[in-house]
Amino acid sequence: MTQAHHDDAGARNALQGGLATDPKHKARIEELAERIEKYRASYYAGHPEISDAAFDALEDELRALDPAHPVLARVGSASLITEWEKARHEIPMGSLNKVVSEDELLGWVARCDEILVKDGHGDGGTGAAPPAPGSISSVAGDLFVAEKLDGISIEVIYKGGKLVDAITRGDGEWGERITANVARMKGIPSRIREKGRLSVRGEIILRLSDMKRHFPGVTSPRNMAAGAAKRFDGQGAEHCTVLFYDVADHLEIPTCRARFAWLRELGFATPQTAHGSVEDVVKLYRRYSSELRAGLDYEIDGLVVYVDSLHVQGLLGDVNRRPRGAVAFKFASPAKVTTVVAIQWDTGPSGRVTPVAIVEPVELAGANVRRASLHNSANVRSLGIGVGDEVLVSRRNDVIPYVEEVVEKRGPVAVPPSVCPVCSAPLVVEGEYLLCRNAACRALIEGRIHNWIDAIGALEWGDKLIEQVVAAGLVREPLDLYKLTVKSIADLDRRGEKSATKCLEQLKSRLPLALPVFLAALGIEGFAIQTARLLVSAGYTTIEKLLAAGEDELAGIPGLGAIKAASIVRGLRARSDEIGRLLAAGIVPVAPEAEGPLAGLTFCFTGAGARPRGELTHLVESSGGRVLNSVTKELNYLVIADVASTSSKAVKARKYGTKLITEDDLDKLIAERRGG
């Protein structure tokens, strides 16, 4: 088995070596190497020109063409351009090899075992012969895992229990001394009980909550953290956090588990960790990919998997300053470089005209991607994107493809349209967006109906049916939904009477609509369900009171503000005729019940559920309960699919003593409190 592995590897290297000498590929290899060096230099100088994903994609392409290329063996950048004082690391800060699949992780474990067997330190887990004294059966059963933080690596030095130095990773040998800024960051103890000299390694990050609160409009926490960490005036550094993961010198600590525990005892914050077998690591990786990662307040791009024993790590050694006993198990990066063949502009349900890049097909996360969103017209200008450009395309959360950046500029910048692609009405510019304001535009009508259906939680109504009733001219505003007949729906393509009856019965079952739901269903910009609840709790318990309210009056409500108040008043006045028609037809909203089985109780929903969020919200509010948007000390119940979940909301809820329940538990709670 081992010999076959080496033979396969030799064959692959021979094939790839042939690619490296093929004239057709030689130019591309040289171009990739030059660009990788350039981007690596800018990355370690603190002003990256492309994202980590784009850099990884270029490295992967070079590795496929020439796996032995010297550029791939380098760590950091040799060309630091900085005005900060340079400082040398006593122990160089290296990097990690990466794996991006479960098979590659298993391959890494197998290689570790092979090395130990070859050097006489293990039996590879075969049990073929009695182990020699002190030998290792296999590393597979003794692995340690930590979150791989997507931040700025740093060495922090303490002497006599005091913080004395903080040096960025730089090129691995030399970094920049930014001690004054690091001292202001969260997670940095100014004093520790260890009185000798101590060098610890950590990562500067910007928590997503801090980014939202202190740097509105910023989209890259890593870039913002890098900028704040190296500002000469230190501004913004206080909002950054440092999480620690390593001790660099002199301590006789036997395992990674003990190392992290010791760091925590000293007062250093660390990323979350786990210990187990390779099977446990794979399960944890899957959980992070599907659930845990999305619930974190900071960005990670994978897990770091260590052989837990530091003695065994030492036996495994390192290659090119990369330890063999640890590996970065990166989340499969659903991003690839491709070429833009066209740019198309689509009018969405809100009236926003969104640019879409039509690209050369690429396989991403199991899907063949030909279209990728460009967000808005301002982003087109910011990217400077045009037809012919080489771009990095990703599938965020393995769902929507986006153009993340221009990797190589080749064509003229795209020019946005001046009229709506659907109805040809003139477009208006509002901030970053191009908007169609034609109320008769088919795209906007569909959008208003979609919003109404989603807000009231009418599960039977799918996208296709909404498109059909709008295209047939049967529906132009929400009131028209309540005028439909079984026959009018059944006559539509592939619709039957049974399906039509279900759709209409569901509409009626949602009546009467709670006032917050009614207001949110109108789809007025800035008028989400939480804002609607805020208004009702402030005493605006009827639609008539709200229609009579002025901007100044609403702006005085805590948590609302002048801008949102103005948007609400404008939106209500613009839709007053439509609201009047709904009221005249008997679709009159009611204030949430002051009494009911859930009166005085608060609920928050998280994760995917068996029923739409709107339906669950309606259930709680019609039973007298209140729905909160986040976990607070005020929350009574967190409704979640798995009450044993370790998501951030679940953890926070347990901390506050909030009870975690399932949707079935919610139904039982209502029945019990009704006395049924």
Swiss-Prot record:
Gene3D superfamilies xref list: 5' to 3' exonuclease, C-terminal subdomain, BRCT domain, DNA ligase/mRNA capping enzyme, Helix hairpin bin, Nucleic acid-binding proteins
Enzyme Commission identifier(s): 6.5.1.2
HAMAP family per UniProt: DNA_ligase_A
Keywords assigned by UniProt, alphabetized: DNA damage, DNA repair, DNA replication, Ligase, Magnesium, Manganese, Metal-binding, NAD, Zinc
Keyword Ligase: yes
Binding site for Zn(2+): 420, 423, 436, 441
MF terms (GO), sorted A to Z: DNA ligase (NAD+) activity; metal ion binding
Example GO BP: DNA replication
Binding site for NAD(+): 52-56, 95-96, 169, 203, 330
Gene this chain is encoded by: ligA
Catalytic residues (UniProt): 148
Location of the region described as Disordered in the Swiss-Prot/TrEMBL record: 1-23
Entries under Pfam families matching the protein: BRCT, DNA_ligase_aden, DNA_ligase_OB, HHH_5
Keyword Transferase: no
Family designation: Belongs to the NAD-dependent DNA ligase family. LigA subfamily.
Compositional bias annotation for Basic and acidic residues: 1-10
NCBIfam families: PRK07956.1 (NF005932)
Summary of the function given for this chain in its UniProt record: DNA ligase that catalyzes the formation of phosphodiester linkages between 5'-phosphoryl and 3'-hydroxyl groups in double-stranded DNA using NAD as a coenzyme and as the energy source for the reaction. It is essential for DNA replication and repair of damaged DNA.
Name the record gives this protein: DNA ligase
Domain named BRCT: residues: 593-676
Cofactor(s) needed by this chain: Mg(2+); Mn(2+)
Catalytic activity: NAD(+) + (deoxyribonucleotide)n-3'-hydroxyl + 5'-phospho-(deoxyribonucleotide)m = (deoxyribonucleotide)n+m + AMP + beta-nicotinamide D-nucleotide
